[in-house]
Amino acid sequence: MKKQHDTIIVLDFGSQYNQLIARRIREFGVYSELHPHTITAEEIKAMNPKGIIFSGGPNSVYGENAFHCDEKIFELGLPIFGICYGMQLMTKHFGGKVERANHREYGKAVLKVENESKLYTNLPEEQVVWMSHGDLVTGLPEGFVVDATSESCPIAGMSNEEKQLYGVQFHPEVRHSEHGNDLIKNFVFGVCGCSEGWNMENFIEVELEKIRETVGDKKVLCALSGGVDSSVVAVLIHKAIGDQLTCIFVDHGLLRKGEAEGVMKTFSEGFHMNVIKIDARERFMKKLKGVEDPEQKRKIIGNEFIYVFDDEAAKLEGIDFLAQGTLYTDIIESGTATAQTIKSHHNVGGLPEDMQFKLIEPLNTLFKDEVRVLGSELGIPDEIVWRQPFPGPGLGIRVLGEITEEKLEIVRESDAILREEIQKAGLDREIWQYFTALPGMRSVGVMGDERTYDYTVGIRAVTSIDGMTADWARIPWDVLEKISVRIVNEVKHVNRVVYDITSKPPATIEWE
């Protein structure tokens, strides 16, 4: 990548939040890259970054499987900011003391600033932060001072300003830390001296060049679903290589109401792309029959997608690349070399080993909100750019347990009602994601003076910036009532509607 902008390097020590750090920095207009903790000091030096951030991680610095870094990184003279595990690693390196806490601290805590280092410039003396750690620093390294404390953590923040070294035991990158963004800003601008200079125009310019260099005169097959991610991928690649791109739209029977027709109209007629539609509904349902495990469903759907593309590509000439809408969040949720796996993502963990294509994933360094900005920059209509996030496995992971046509129809119809009412209420831009799910449980009800024993539909609606963390949406009661009444009255075999009020973490946004 041509770097005409300042860069902050984030070292990955296994935290599920590590890519959030890079995301927060990009929000400030400063480019940030995530790299494995095994990167060498020489490699970092060659990148000429303005500063380094050590992410958190699930391990203990004294554990057998502890992650370490090249100790020469501390000799580069660059500002370093250690978060959670990163602070503990810094402490150990400089001779301080790290011990196991009496109990794991997880959740919100009140932080008290004791020393206003550059990290805490213009921040309140007390603030709510997000803790998630099992070890803590109990003895400062020489030359360091305590910056902040909390009730359960006497050294919640530390610094050695002469060497430009900083550490915090909490997670400023998580939205629950109320002044976390300001704290990271203080490091990026106040300590590292960065200037704003990275934006989506830069990304488009670099990515178009990269796509052309990678593809050359070869042909690309794009998995087009009509969702935000695949739509942006298709338009971006089409802008780069034109008719060298062929889009395949697979109707696997797991789509939302009216989606198949909408995709063909928008991309084939609107964007004048070469789009081939494949009706694979029977093929997918046959493979998924009797399958209840969510991981197995994801793998089957991911594999079947690739096999469908293989079959179709065999009919085409010279297809070398498969384009996918894999995002940063897909990769982190599927686990990296250091991150613990939460769930397999259809764009990451579901690919067969004998796949015939080379992958091209131009969005795999972007978060969802960045993809929307990119889509707008590319001239994609708002109705697509602001479309609800929809997973590759589609309604297949919104029907919990075994998938049947009856269950799919329940989710499809109830989801259409939910989306219609949310839009009518003017909440479609306020709520980050909303959908219905079918948990597969039945309950007793009374309809028309008769006893019923039918399904329960779950509503999931969350507010978020990038999908890494999320809070349940406070939908007005009257809107929820309309949605519930319509679903129970208009969708067959449903007699109960429930609303999911769980945040992420501890839950994920999707139910499977």
From Swiss-Prot:
Residues 7-197 form the Glutamine amidotransferase type-1 domain. Disulfide bonds: none annotated. Gene3D superfamilies: 3.30.300.10, 3.40.50.880, HUPs. Pathway: Purine metabolism; GMP biosynthesis; GMP from XMP (L-Gln route): step 1/1. Keywords: ATP-binding, Glutamine amidotransferase, GMP biosynthesis, Ligase, Nucleotide-binding, Purine biosynthesis. It catalyses: XMP + L-glutamine + ATP + H2O = GMP + L-glutamate + AMP + diphosphate + 2 H(+). It comes from the Bacteria. One of its GO terms (cellular component) is cytosol. It holds the Pfam family GATase. GO terms for molecular function: ATP binding; GMP synthase activity. Its EC number is 6.3.5.2. ATP binds at residues 225-231. The active site is at residues 84, 171, 173. PROSITE patterns: GATASE_TYPE_1, GMPS_ATP_PPASE. Residues 198-387 form the GMPS ATP-PPase domain. Homodimer. Catalyzes the synthesis of GMP from XMP. PANTHER family: GMP SYNTHASE [GLUTAMINE-HYDROLYZING] (PTHR11922:SF2), GMP SYNTHASE-RELATED (PTHR11922). This is GMP synthase [glutamine-hydrolyzing].
